[in-house]
Amino acid sequence: MSTDTIPSLSSPPAPEFPSTTPDTATSPAPSQPSIIGPSSLAPFPETTTNIDGGSRNVALTGLITGVVLGATFVLLGVCIFVCFYKRKKRKLKKKKKEDIEASINRDSLDPKDDSNNLQQWSSSEIGQNLFTYEDLSKATSNFSNTNLLGQGGFGYVHRGVLVDGTLVAIKQLKSGSGQGEREFQAEIQTISRVHHRHLVSLLGYCITGAQRLLVYEFVPNKTLEFHLHEKERPVMEWSKRMKIALGAAKGLAYLHEDCNPKTIHRDVKAANILIDDSYEAKLADFGLARSSLDTDTHVSTRIMGTFGYLAPEYASSGKLTEKSDVFSIGVVLLELITGRRPVDKSQPFADDDSIVDWAKPLMIQALNDGNFDGLVDPRLENDFDINEMTRMVACAAASVRHSAKRRPKMSQIVRAFEGNISIDDLTEGAAPGQSTIYSLDGSSDYSSTQYKEDLKKFKKMAFESKTFGSSECSGLTSDNGQNPSGSSSITEGQRTTQEIEPEKNTKDT
């Protein structure tokens, strides 16, 4: 076989492999390997992801901001509304009070305006029952004289029966009386907020045009004045006198020390102490009463109160405080002890016409030697408990001291009656009549002699006046106006309201 026909065996061409030796002159430097995968993987669309997340954040932030702003605006609106409402309410309250004061100071009343103003003020501030004039007219048989209990300087008192059968005493103030309007306001402001078994209860009121009426609980057994001083009355037993004294003292102690603010009665007297069938005492007639917030700065330019019961400091300074009430209750105690009136009507200008001046030397003697002859009501015929009499005389003596700040508190009087403190604690070692200082600032230039001179001046002015009047509420239980307090004589315990300016014999505090 020739060689031409034999295919030649040749090696296949060697494959070409890229060179593993980099050309440093032309090849770029190798990059660092990626930690998340091969370099050939497509990158995440970072730009698109940032846009979506930002939108969600903006939306969430906007939502939170809207909620916060909305809540803030709502809260702010509520605060503004509350502030505006309270401010408006204060203005309305102030305006109502100003309207009342304006109506009080006017000589003639505008029935339409004053009725509306007083009704709005009373119903919102007092909260007592509001009666119509027709209700009360029907209850008293058209204010018949047969139902007349008594009358005073500013009105009449009738017995009445309400629709539900409740027996009441209805005080009708004289129309157009400025003082009567003041007393109406004082009564509903004072007695509507005090509640005590020894204070008469106010059941409601009526305002119709110029008519002003007050509705009280009916106290059936008349007044202390009636039982002590009315002619042909049986002698009041000592035990009943003691019970009445304790009850009246408790009622006054409540006004002075348990009320907030404390209340000064300013017309404590036997005619204003009502008695029920059990001979429990109820203090009545708050027409002159004031809270301590008023009396701290108030100087009266009218003679307020009742002659024979007025405290010495009032004759000089024109101020009445709780210690003035204490003096007045001391006079009532002397009436219970002696059976005498506070002023001797047969000697209205005598030096010793006052029960206080008459009784002081006798009280000194009685407390020193235990001899009550000449001091105690002879109608008792020595039928009394000697220990109770000693305590009552000691209470009376301490209460009528000329020095107002040395008079005891009413709570001390109550404890002394109950035997819970000694007489020495009550009297503080001072005999009746020893103290002539009365002024609260400690000055000593006002004596009992000067007091008598001032009191004479007051009496003379009241006798010459045609406008003085008595305590109308003292007739709450007296029949047909026969209660002596309804007479025109100030020597029988007459209240007067003549305008004067008391002389300032001491420094006013």
Curated annotation (Swiss-Prot):
Coiled-coil regions listed in the entry: none
Tissue and organ distribution: Mostly expressed in inflorescence bolts, and, to a lower extent, in flower buds and siliques.
The name this protein goes by in its record: Proline-rich receptor-like protein kinase PERK15
Organism in which the protein naturally occurs: Arabidopsis thaliana (Mouse-ear cress)
Compositionally skewed regions (Low complexity) per UniProt: 18-34
Location of this chain's protein in the cell: Cell membrane
Biased composition, class Polar residues, residue ranges: 468-499
Major location category of this protein: membrane
GO-annotated cellular components: plasma membrane
Catalytic activity: L-seryl-[protein] + ATP = O-phospho-L-seryl-[protein] + ADP + H(+); L-threonyl-[protein] + ATP = O-phospho-L-threonyl-[protein] + ADP + H(+)
Post-translational modification Phosphotyrosine, affected residues: Y216, Y314
Transmembrane segments: 62-82
PANTHER family on file: PROLINE-RICH RECEPTOR-LIKE PROTEIN KINASE PERK15 (PTHR47982:SF33), PROLINE-RICH RECEPTOR-LIKE PROTEIN KINASE PERK4 (PTHR47982)
Binding site residues for ATP: L149, G150, Q151, G152, G153, F154, G155, Y156, V157, K171
Family indicated by similarity: Belongs to the protein kinase superfamily. Ser/Thr protein kinase family.
